């Protein structure tokens, strides 16, 4: 008997447009948490757990910022520094509105994972404080900085993308009206 297919947008990686990208993204998101939580079961070396967790967090940050965000939801961001003034600002990039169709499953996985991970790290910070294991707080602080930075940047990037799409459609609509008006005026003077 054939099993029913999951509905589009449901949390099934099989519906993903980019399953390898999605699974790698989720693997990086989960691996740093797993090493932090269960690393002491395999080794008593706190420094090794610290280093492995930091490396996994850095890989997650890079992969999310440069690969997964672009492929899964069509968004990318980076920080630019003006060499003459030294001012830095964030630059947001989104795919063209008609050029890429965003898969609902990819989008749901992406946004759930991007907002859930900082919440997990906040919970782990609370656990570290209340269990008096302050040695873990620097690691949790680094994890929070990296995950919250990506969360904020992609949230702003998404808002920028939506605003650009609205402005672009209004601008294109204005061009259409302008071209119709200029054609009508042009015809009037050529007669």
From Swiss-Prot:
A Gene Ontology term for the protein's cellular component: Golgi membrane
Transmembrane annotation, as ranges: 15-35, 37-57, 109-129, 134-154
InterPro entries in the cross-refs: TVP23-like
Annotated localization: Golgi apparatus membrane
An annotated GO BP: protein secretion
Membrane topology: Multi-pass membrane protein
Keywords associated with the record: Glycoprotein, Golgi apparatus, Membrane, Transmembrane, Transmembrane helix
UniProt-listed PANTHER family: GOLGI APPARATUS MEMBRANE PROTEIN TVP23 (PTHR13019:SF7)
Functional description taken from the UniProt entry: Golgi membrane protein involved in vesicular trafficking.
Protein name: Golgi apparatus membrane protein TVP23
Organism whose genome encodes this protein: Podospora anserina (strain S / ATCC MYA-4624 / DSM 980 / FGSC 10383)
Lineage: Eukaryota, Fungi, Dikarya, Ascomycota, Pezizomycotina
Gene from which the chain derives: TVP23
């Amino acid at each position: 008997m054939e099993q029913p297919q999951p509905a589009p947008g449901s949390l099934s990686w099989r519906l993903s447009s980019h399953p390898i990208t999605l699974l790698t993204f989720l693997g990086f998101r989960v691996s740093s948490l797993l090493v932090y939580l269960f690393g002491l079961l395999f080794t008593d070396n706190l420094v090794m757990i610290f280093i492995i967790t930091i490396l996994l967090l850095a890989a997650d940050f890079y992969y999310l910022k440069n690969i997964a965000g672009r492929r899964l939801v069509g968004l990318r961001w980076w920080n630019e520094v003006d060499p003459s003034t030294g001012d830095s600002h964030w630059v947001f990039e989104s795919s063209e509105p008609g050029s890429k169709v965003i898969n609902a499953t990819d989008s749901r996985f992406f946004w759930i994972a991007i907002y859930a991970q900082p919440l997990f790290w906040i919970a782990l910070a609370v656990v570290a404080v209340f269990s008096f294991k302050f040695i873990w707080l620097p690691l949790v602080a680094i994890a929070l900085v990296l995950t919250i930075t990506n969360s904020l940047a992609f949230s702003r990037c998404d808002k920028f993308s939506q605003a650009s799409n609205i402005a672009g459609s209004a601008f294109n609509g204005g061009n259409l009206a302008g071209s119709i008006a200029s054609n009508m005026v042009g015809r009037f003077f050529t007669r």
